[in-house]
Amino acid sequence: MGQELSQHERYVEQLKQALKTRGVKVKYADLLKFFDFVKDTCPWFPQEGTIDIKRWRRVGDCFQDYYNTFGPEKVPVTAFSYWNLIKELIDKKEVNPQVMAAVAQTEEILKSNSQTDLTKTSQNPDLDLISLDSDDEGAKSSSLQDKGLSSTKKPKRFPVLLTAQTSKDPEDPNPSEVDWDGLEDEAAKYHNPDWPPFLTRPPPYNKATPSAPTVMAVVNPKEELKEKIAQLEEQIKLEELHQALISKLQKLKTGNETVTHPDTAGGLSRTPHWPGQHIPKGKCCASREKEEQIPKDIFPVTETVDGQGQAWRHHNGFDFAVIKELKTAASQYGATAPYTLAIVESVADNWLTPTDWNTLVRAVLSGGDHLLWKSEFFENCRDTAKRNQQAGNGWDFDMLTGSGNYSSTDAQMQYDPGLFAQIQAAATKAWRKLPVKGDPGASLTGVKQGPDEPFADFVHRLITTAGRIFGSAEAGVDYVKQLAYENANPACQAAIRPYRKKTDLTGYIRLCSDIGPSYQQGLAMAAAFSGQTVKDFLNNKNKEKGGCCFKCGKKGHFAKNCHEHAHNNAEPKVPGLCPRCKRGKHWANECKSKTDNQGNPIPPHQGNRVEGPAPGPETSLWGSQLCSSQQKQPISKLTRATPGSAGLDLCSTSHTVLTPEMGPQALSTGIYGPLPPNTFGLILGRSSITMKGLQVYPGVIDNDYTGEIKIMAKAVNNIVTVSQGNRIAQLILLPLIETDNKVQQPYRGQGSFGSSDIYWVQPITCQKPSLTLWLDDKMFTGLIDTGADVTIIKLEDWPPNWPITDTLTNLRGIGQSNNPKQSSKYLTWRDKENNSGLIKPFVIPNLPVNLWGRDLLSQMKIMMCSPNDIVTAQMLAQGYSPGKGLGKKENGILHPIPNQGQSNKKGFGNF
């Protein structure tokens, strides 16, 4: 016994030195107590004679079972810490010679002890697990019987085996055929509450007269160990082959697919657990099948258990959907926003290695934030490593950061769950210390309501964005309410404005519930025809027309027309120079002159003659005189914007709304020729008008032109409103150079816009002029009927699922239709050139053909002219092909345009 203790003490001393080389100091007495505890809880361990990671993990499982059964007061405080330290030594025994020597000597001691335990069962009955009598003990059987084995000897650890030894059953099993692992599991069932209860009780003890135990042959320990070693080597080969196939299959997979282990192959998935949570490896397969199965592609590190109960860990890639969502949240709301932190915490709940954390942060954050996170993470790991060193668990800085000997992913995969928890705490703590960049509310102020977006959907987007920034929508409810009004479209703002301070966000939604696309369309048309923007139209809609007099406070007149205090004026105003004739000092409404001081005729007075002082020279809002007047004004009445302006300002005399579908339109200016002598005019558009979407076409005004100067303008993209008096063009006067060229016409006169030479020709043939259009993507063919006011569709061609309603209108033509039906909604028409518009046709039964009326033809801008024979001959001479028209893609212009123009031309054209 002394020799056994000396070997045991020598092994403990070498183990102490091996731990000291790794920087861990332990007490010799504590190690002795620890191995005594190992013998008590794991009596099978000395008999194995081998120390490897698999058996040492079984020792850890026994510790956990013992802890769960008898409580923490029966377990030494340092038991689990020493178990972790020795586990690390076993993992690193190949790289440390001293550790290899300590492990080898321990195995030798265990093998020798296992032989002595088999032969010395009577000397140490407390440590005897199973009594095996050898041939040498045959002579002692009678003495054993005399001692009264059943009454004097202490009971064995396994009563079932003791009963089997003392029974007189002639069919006792051969000790060499005993399943030692099965007996171990059976013994564990007596104190493991996780195992299912026994259905039958063990056989009772035989209380008859003790008899001599059956003499059995002693099992050769070497042969048994060789047999177990061969089995283990075969199992290792199979496991290596199994892992190689799994690795090869994972490489063949693409995307997030991972290898699944079906139950038929013996592979059961085990999900990661929280630190401190432990599942004994001796549980039956039925209990494992009840565990929640989680897809493996969610966790970078997963663990599977094969049919033999062996646990294997695998490393999978991140789910790219999670990375994309985290990247979007960090970029849009900030790295420390509540929504971003919630995603980080959900990812951190899994087993992430230090390499996984570094990869995730580098992919999601910017370069500077990644360096900040890394510095904070390393600092947190240093603090954690110091606490681990004080606790003596051996989890150092290299393990926490994945550096040094733990830089590979394979080494990091073998970390304990507790170490994964420490890495998670350090990483998330570093993430929370990232600085806040920019304005967190910038993304919230950028949420604006679209023109056709329902107000409820807009508020939902606001609340969702606010919840991701502030953590909850209630935290920023006042801010959201303010933005719900300021970022709403003009229609919703007008509906909310009277009740803005009287209701909450729910009231806003109720007020704007009826505002839809149709309301927006009608509002835009009303604002366009009133010459205002939608916002100005809504602001001025509820204002009372007419103001109050600033003198008397009464409504109905202004201060300049107030007669309330007219008698208080001590000195009457003296009229100045007459703005009409510029010849004398009198009021303009009292002027009787027919011509001005330059001899130009003065137009007569218009409108009511109101007594009072003269209003002075008539000017427009922009400074141009007489731009809004309906009178005929000469060129001399035009003004320049500044002394350095090159052109004279031209204004519109009426309020006009232009749309892109209308094409070029001639706008009146009220200015008439002729131009000053020896000059001609060039009309150009203003830059500010071009920026607003109104295109002004250039034009030339001849010196002898006496008609009205008009402006050719077109709306480019959107609806453009030209208010009365707005400066939209300028007239530039240039010197006229006279040459000896032949003159076709002695005097231009008032011939102005309009063409008498170019026509859209519809040949009149025996065939009816038909046209094919698409109404809501359904094709219809009808006649072009310029005599029909409205478009009419046959009831037989009308789709039955399109709604129609009765009308109170009577259609008259060749026949008569009383109360015809009409489409309940506007239909979108489209031609072959993708021109489109809206139409609401009538539907009449028994109509022979569909009729395209003027309501549709006017939108298509169709012009039908009737040229005379002379014009037709001229067009044919220029290469016109009947039914095809002019152009190089049709028949082409065969000859250049001649220089001889028409002598009595009016407007455009050269034929």
Curated annotation (Swiss-Prot):
Residues 101-161 form a propeptide. GO terms for molecular function: aspartic-type endopeptidase activity; DNA binding; dUTP diphosphatase activity; structural constituent of virion; zinc ion binding. Its EC number is 3.6.1.23, 3.4.23.-. One of its GO terms (biological process) is viral translational frameshifting. It catalyses: dUTP + H2O = dUMP + diphosphate + H(+). It comes from the Viruses. Residues 216-257 form a coiled coil. Nucleocapsid protein p14: Nucleocapsid protein. This is Gag-Pro polyprotein. It comes from Mason-Pfizer monkey virus (MPMV). The lineage of its organism: Viruses, Riboviria, Pararnavirae, Artverviricota, Revtraviricetes.
